[in-house]
Amino acid sequence: MPARKGALYPLSASPRYSFFYAGGIMLKSALRSTIGSFVISLLLAAVMALLVGLRRWHRQGHKALRTRMKAQPQIIIFWHEHLFVMSPLLPSGCSALQSPHPDGRVLAGASRLFGLRPIWGSSNRKAASGLRQLVGEIKSGRSVVITPDGPRGPRRALSMGPVSLSQLTGAPITLAAWSGNRLWRAPSWDKMRFPKPLGRANLIYSDAIMLEKTKDKNALEAQRQMLEDKLNALVEACDNAQTGQK
C-alpha cells in the first residue's frame, strides 16, 4: 500500500533507517549479555579517558576536596548533564548511586574502572534501598556521588535525596561542575555535555556545605532550594570562567 502524505511511520519502517534500527537491536542484545555489557563498559571507559586526556584541565578545589575526604566522608553532587566525564575526574574511593537498568549497569562498569563503587537504586522503586546503602557507605567512611536530577529529570531540579542523606549521616555536601570551550550537547532531556578534543576545560568543586539538623518540612525544603540555587550558580560560574579564557 503506498504511503499517505503526512502519515507517520516508525523509523524501522523506512529503509533509510533500517541500518540504525538493526544497530539499536544489536546494542540492546549486547547490553543484556554479561560479556557484551563488559565489552561496552571497556569501550565506554576508553572513550571517557580519551576525551578527558585530550583536554587541558584547570581544577579548582580538587586538593581541598581530597583533604576533606580523608577527614570525613563527603556527599558530592553534580547535575546529570555533567555525568559522562566525571568518573575519570572524581577522586578515587567514592561510591556512586547508579540506575539498575542495562544502560546504567554499563556506565557503572565503566565507572568502576576509575575507582567508583556502584550503589544500585536510583530508580523510583529502589530509591529507599539506594538511600539506605548510601548511608551505609558513608558510615563505613566512603564518600558518595549523586546526580540529584537523574535519571529522568526534570533537568537541574534538585531532588530531596542529598538533603535526606546529609540529615541522616551529618556528612557535608560538596558541589561540582565542569565546562569547556568546545562542547557537544546531546539531544536528551539533560542536554548532556561531551568535551570535544584538544580544548580547555574547568572543573570546580565548592567548599563543604553543612546542613543544620532539622525535621521541619519547610526548613528541609529551604535547604533543598538552597543547594539547587548554589549548584546552578556554580555551573554558571564555571561556564563564565571558561568563556573568559577564550
Where are these regions (language model features)?
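N-terminal amphipathic/basic-hydrophobic helices that include classical n-h-c signal peptides
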Residues: 1-25
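Catalytic-site beta-strand/loop segments enriched in glycine and acidic/polar residues
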Residues: 133-165, 169
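A cross-family acyltransferase "interaction/gating" segment
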Residues: 157-217
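Catalytic core of membrane glycerolipid acyltransferases/transacylases, capturing the structured
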Residues: 73-125, 169, 185
